[in-house]
Amino acid sequence: MIKTDVIVIGAGAAGLFCATEAGKRGRNVIVFDHAKRLGGKILMSGGGRCNFTNMHTSHENFLSQNPHFCKSALSQYTQWDFISLVNEYGIKHHEKTLGQLFCDDTAKDIVDMLLAECKKAQVDIKNRTEIIDIEFAENRYIVNTSQGAFSSESLVIATGGLSMPKLGATPFGYRIAEQFGIPIIPTKAALVPFTLHEHDKAVIGELSGISVDASASCNNTS
């Protein structure tokens, strides 16, 4: 069994950034991800250009059962800190609208930046790795994987939500949370596609992928 200080499951934006910060603090970190390609959702975000932050981000923009957490987290690391990191790597970006910042070139720039930060912090990333099960014994987490057994003092689950199953999204993180007695708020779909009848597809199908400024309302709510 391989021992380490921190195990992070999930190599998306949150997992990679968390691993970097732990590594900077002198912790030995291993990141596991089942995907072949890391940062899949990042690469798709913002139409492939990654809307990586918003200049007007505030704790007031978040809904939470613990509002103080958002306030505390955002006071310790602000959007300006992340923008400084992006600038440090020479990633060109622009404001699209309402403070939204997008890469000029491609979302891959952000993925490469996060991976470079992990490398600087000596984070060990193991992709194409399936998690078989997780146990807790003698004050350590034991993670059994397709690459063998690993144990750590700290465990971070950063597997994301249920959106985009084609990118590998699963209820894994929710199951682990329940296993360790962490309460789960019932999930609801937030972003959903239009589902069209076949005759409608024939008429407007060619419009797929075109973006326009629009407003929508339902029952006097928009």
What are these regions (language model features)?
Residues 9, 44, 157-158:
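Redox-cofactor binding/interface segments in oxidoreductases and associated redox assembly factors
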Residues 34-124, 129:
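Conserved N-terminal/central alpha/beta ligand/cofactor-binding core
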Residues 1-3, 137:
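Short helix-loop-beta connector
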Residues 8, 12-13, 37, 161-163:
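Residue-level detector of alpha-helix initiation sites
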Residues 11, 34, 189:
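Cofactor-binding loop segments of dinucleotide-utilizing enzymes, especially the Rossmann-like FAD-
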